[in-house]
């Protein structure tokens, strides 16, 4: 469905359009036809003409300056950008120069930009560049004190410079506190470490070196740990060497760990390395027993790190058919961060309910998870399983399912709606509120200018910073309106995800209906909603996305996979075209369809295989049973997937699928249960 949408007044103002153009129908020339219920791409020519205070020639000069700065040609960039002055294109050009060239610009230039544009997004990045330049140029103590007068350092080098300036003016205690804080809590390279030691070595105590030693181990930075250990003693060196052996999987950790004294062996970093060593060498029961020995208060200092170990050990124990011990490992957590606490209590409750048939005890854990949960996904999961536990005890579960069902954009919210027999998905439109003030924000003006210049990667950087900075849901929704107006699905989704993290969900903006070429969708061998669901999870609609493993484009295809699919669909293979949206989706949809076919129609197996590969899926079928045979609860099967990334991936794709069916087809029935049960052996 294609409709025209008049942009909100604040957006008109942000673009600098004359008020006369804001009358009904006056913007038809600016906004094109779009798919769904939001405007899509703004025509570049009209956008350039409409934005205030600069010409199309200025915009072109900005683009050329950006290219020059990215290429490292500061002189050319300056020659192009200087005539732009303080216009938005001029500000953007200088910002890009700071981003790309950093200390080459000099401290004075960077600090001047920070002073002149305190509201420009990415302040932390620019302060980092300024501090690096300040240190490189050995600025005077007066300049250093002035720069840090209202803000604390963001780099270890900046902290050292400030501490030295403090010492020069007699503020020895403040300087010492700052040095100790950065020494114990931040990782930095050996040359800077030596500068810290030269200037403040006498102020660093054994406890400060031990904190740095711990930070190196907990961050799995063996070099930092070894250097810190050498300042502590031979035993700590032995533990650091054992840590490196575990990180590098050299097989020599056992001998080193056996040499530790009982005192050091019972310190938190030693527990961490001993447990990780046991887990990585498949001594899972021993790892579980050691986890039970850590004092709760001690573990709580790094509760998140130790929860990761507990989660991995607990799931291994389930694979070994030891659910009682798995429960004890999960329930014994000392997690402090809310997401970790929620996951830990869910895991403990799920083991009790589904593996040990103890619904009353399970309910206590689900209650704890529900009490702590904040995000829609975690709230829906906790309350859904509260309902399952209540049912298992013969009690009315309706109120729990109703609570979960309110979060219709989530996997467990949809399962709750299906359990209640409800139709439709409650994905609301964005919140309303006064947002005209946004047009005055320099970051918004810069964003509109970057879109007019088709600098989308830079625009996304501003978008992400603004999404964390804007004060309320109405402002975030308005920002998403702007990115939607420019047809930037990746930016719109990024805003929605950040909004959800901030507990300010935006509803419909979280599921863009643009960003995928319609022609490629029309030729897909699988339902279009499925392609959207995978794309949203794979690349978040970024056509240029490239993973660390080499997967590319909207549907994140590995070149080898894409080559096979190209041969099968009868198109020439060109690895360079994998970032072309049409080409990528054509091959990606073919691959997805083939996976569904290979798994005899099973969606959950195909989704898992798309993420983790068919080989792993076949291993999981052997280990946990086949969810297609009707004897295995597919909900439990998904929860048994040992890879956290893949387990989360399957659930997110399935929830995306339901929403996109609703948006694309106006489908009211919820088919998530059918999707879980699809396929024949």
Tell where the protein language model's regions lie, with residue ranges.
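Bacterial N-terminal signal peptides
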Residues: 11-20
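Solenoid-like repeat scaffolds
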Residues: 48-54, 78-88, 99-102, 112-121, ...
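Catalytic glycan-binding domains that act on GlcNAc-containing polysaccharides
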Residues: 95, 111-112, 116, 281, ...
């Amino acid at each position: 469905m294609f409709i025209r949408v008049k942009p909100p007044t604040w957006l008109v103002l942000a673009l600098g359009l004359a008020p006369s153009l804001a009358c009904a129908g006056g913007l038809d020339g600016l906004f094109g036809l779009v798919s769904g219920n939001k405007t899509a791409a703004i025509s570049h020519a009209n956008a350039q003409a409409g934005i205030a205070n600069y010409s199309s020639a200025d915009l072109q000069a900005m683009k050329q300056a950006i290219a020059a700065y990215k290429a490292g040609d500061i002189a050319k960039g300056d020659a192009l950008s200087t005539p732009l002055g303080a216009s938005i294109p001029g500000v953007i050009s200088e910002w890009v120069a700071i981003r790309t060239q950093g200390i080459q610009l000099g401290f004075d230039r960077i600090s001047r930009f920070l002073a002149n544009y305190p509201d420009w997004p990415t302040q932390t990045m620019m302060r980092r560049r300024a501090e690096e330049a300040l240190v490189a140029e050995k600025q005077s103590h007066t300049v250093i004190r002035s720069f840090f007068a209202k803000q604390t350092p963001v780099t270890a080098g900046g902290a050292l410079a400030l501490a030295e300036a403090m010492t020069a003016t007699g503020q020895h205690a403040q300087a010492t506190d700052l040095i100790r804080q950065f020494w114990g809590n931040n990782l930095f390279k050996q040359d800077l470490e030596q500068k810290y030691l030269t200037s403040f070595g006498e102020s660093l105590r054994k406890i400060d070196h031990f904190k740095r030693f711990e930070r190196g181990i907990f961050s799995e930075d063996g070099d930092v740990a070894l250097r810190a250990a050498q300042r502590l003693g031979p035993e700590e060196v032995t533990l650091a060497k054992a840590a490196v052996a575990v990180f590098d999987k050299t097989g020599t950790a056992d001998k080193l760990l056996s040499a530790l004294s009982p005192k050091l062996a019972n310190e938190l970093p030693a527990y961490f390395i001993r447990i990780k060593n046991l887990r990585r060498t498949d001594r899972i029961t021993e790892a579980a027993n050691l986890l039970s020995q850590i004092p709760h208060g001690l573990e709580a200092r790094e509760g998140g790190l130790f929860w990761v170990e507990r989660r991995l050990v607990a799931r291994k124990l389930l694979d070994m058919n030891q659910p009682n011990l798995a429960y004890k490992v999960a329930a014994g957590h000392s997690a402090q961060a809310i997401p970790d606490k929620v996951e830990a209590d869910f895991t403990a409750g799920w083991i009790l309910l589904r593996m040990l048939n103890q619904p009353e005890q399970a309910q206590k854990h689900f209650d704890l998870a529900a009490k702590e949960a904040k995000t829609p996904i975690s709230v829906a999961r906790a309350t859904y399983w509260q309902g399952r536990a209540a049912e298992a005890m013969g009690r009315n579960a309706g109120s729990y399912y109703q609570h979960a069902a309110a979060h219709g954009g989530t996997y467990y919210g949809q399962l709750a709606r299906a359990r209640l027999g409800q139709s439709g998905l409650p994905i609301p439109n964005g919140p309303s509120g006064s947002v005209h003030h946004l047009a005055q924000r320099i970051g918004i003006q810069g964003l509109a200018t970057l879109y007019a210049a088709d600098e989308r990667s830079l625009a996304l950087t501003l978008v992400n910073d603004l999404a964390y900075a804007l004060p309320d849901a109405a402002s975030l929704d308005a920002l998403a309106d702007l990115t939607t107006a420019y047809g930037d699905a990746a930016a719109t989704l990024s805003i929605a995800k950040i909004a959800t993290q901030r507990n300010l969900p935006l509803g419909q903006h979280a599921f863009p209906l643009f960003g995928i070429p319609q022609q490629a969708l029309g030729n897909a061998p699988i339902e279009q909603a499925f392609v959207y669901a995978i794309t949203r999870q794979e690349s978040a609609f970024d056509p240029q996305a490239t993973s660390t493993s080499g997967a590319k484009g909207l549907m994140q295809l590995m070149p080898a996979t894409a080559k096979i699919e190209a041969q099968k669909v009868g198109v020439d293979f060109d690895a360079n075209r994998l970032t072309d949206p049409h080409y990528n989706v054509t091959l990606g949809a073919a691959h997805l369809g083939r996976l569904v076919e290979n798994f005899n129609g099973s969606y959950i197996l195909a989704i898992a295989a798309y993420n983790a590969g068919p080989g792993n899926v076949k291993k999981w079928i052997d280990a946990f049973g086949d969810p297609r045979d009707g004897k295995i609860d597919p909900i439990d099967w998904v929860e048994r997937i040992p890879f956290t990334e893949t387990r989360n991936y399957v659930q997110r794709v399935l929830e995306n699928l339901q929403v996109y069916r609703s948006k694309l087809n106006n489908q009211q029935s919820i088919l998530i249960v059918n999707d879980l049960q699809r396929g024949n052996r």
